[in-house]
Design a protein with these regions (language model features):
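Cell-wall glycan-active module
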Residues: 1-162, 171, 214, 218-239, ...
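Non-membrane alpha-helical structural segments and their capping/turn regions in soluble enzymes
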Residues: 137, 202, 206-210, 240, ...
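Functional cleft and adjacent loop/helix regions within the main domain
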Residues: 247
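Alpha-helix capping and helix-loop boundary segments enriched in small/acidic/polar residues
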Residues: 171-179, 199-203, 207, 237, ...
Length: 309
């Protein structure tokens, strides 16, 4: 059973198809404007030598752009390679949908870029409104203290806060996950939080931070360690690849990630494991699960850039 469900990520992917004879209205990525000095916030840094490998990968560049674009803009992308083929206006997409021209359009894109008919072209609206770094900054500061006290690397808190309902802490997923950490009821109760009709401690940031940190310590990290060992890797809690594997456990649950890791099999190193997980489906480990660590990395890189402005 999944530990928790990610809110709203499935909505990022609409399998829609576009045409080359479209008059394209490209809108440039708009950077977020901060009403609070960004240098007043804390950022849990990832070592540059570890980050550089992943930041060059097409999926990360793709999600970086999605996070910066407003919902009025849309990216046309090849699903498997994350090759960004076009940026069009959302109005143009709506017009194509209304006039039932999407299937013809998709084939035009495939033909133009040399893809087979069976390969998927996807369309993703910008999500800038969802990723509000100005609101996340103060939360990272508070969460870092809690995670440090419990002995868990606060990089996990930062990843989660950057991608889990950052602009709507009261969000509730269809599976019942609630709050900044999108905790399921049974997880919250396990760590002493009250979840009832009259009171829900998952809305209490300090208490939910404590529960998320303990979940990482007791469940996510140990399971990620065992999975790494099972395919011949030495788990290193300070390595980015291991932290991303742990994030997958937080998102999809150990059982689903274990199936995906087993499907990947033997790899040369942890970085290769993560890249292969991004393309692996096993059990309930599907598209949203693949995207989770990609979003974590892309949002971190954009957050870091935002703080440096």
């Amino acid at each position: 059973m999944n530990v928790r469900k990610i809110m709203g990520l499935n909505g990022l992917w609409l399998v829609l198809l576009l045409s080359l004879n479209t008059v394209v209205s490209c809108q440039s990525a708009t950077k977020q404007t901060s009403s609070v000095p960004s240098d007043s916030f804390h950022c849990v840094q990832i070592p540059k030598e570890q980050l550089d490998f992943f930041r060059q990968q097409p999926p990360i560049k793709f999600w970086q752009k999605v996070i910066l674009l407003t919902k009025d803009s849309c990216i046309v992308v090849h699903k498997d390679s994350r090759n960004m083929m076009d940026v069009i206006s959302a109005k143009r997409l709506d017009s194509l949908v209304d006039y039932s021209k999407l299937e013809i359009a998709a084939q035009c894109y495939r033909d133009s870029f040399g893809y087979e008919t069976c390969e998927l072209v996807k369309f993703v609206r910008g999500k800038r409104e969802f990723f509000d770094f100005n609101k996340v900054g103060p939360l990272v500061d508070d969460a870092k203290k809690v995670f440090d006290e419990i002995g868990v690397n606060p990089i996990y808190a930062q990843f989660i806060l950057l991608i889990e309902s950052p602009n709507n802490p009261k969000a509730r997923s269809i599976s019942g996950a609630v709050g900044h950490y999108q905790l399921m009821p049974f997880v919250a109760k396990k760590y002493g939080l009250v979840v009832s009709g009259a009171r829900d401690d998952r809305h209490d940031f300090q208490l939910s931070s404590m529960a998320a940190a303990k979940l990482m310590r007791d469940y996510c990290i140990p399971n990620a360690q065992r999975m790494a060992i099972s395919i011949g890797l030495e788990p290193n809690l300070d390595q980015l690849w291991f932290q991303l594997l742990t994030m997958h456990v937080y998102n999809a649950g150990a059982g689903n990630v274990r199936k995906a890791v087993a499907a990947v099999g033997t790899v040369r190193n942890g970085e290769e494991l993560i890249l292969k997980l991004w393309k692996t489906q096993a059990g309930a480990f599907g598209n949203s699960s693949q995207n989770y660590s990609q979003l974590a990395l892309a949002s971190y890189i954009n957050y870091l850039d935002w703080m440096r402005e």
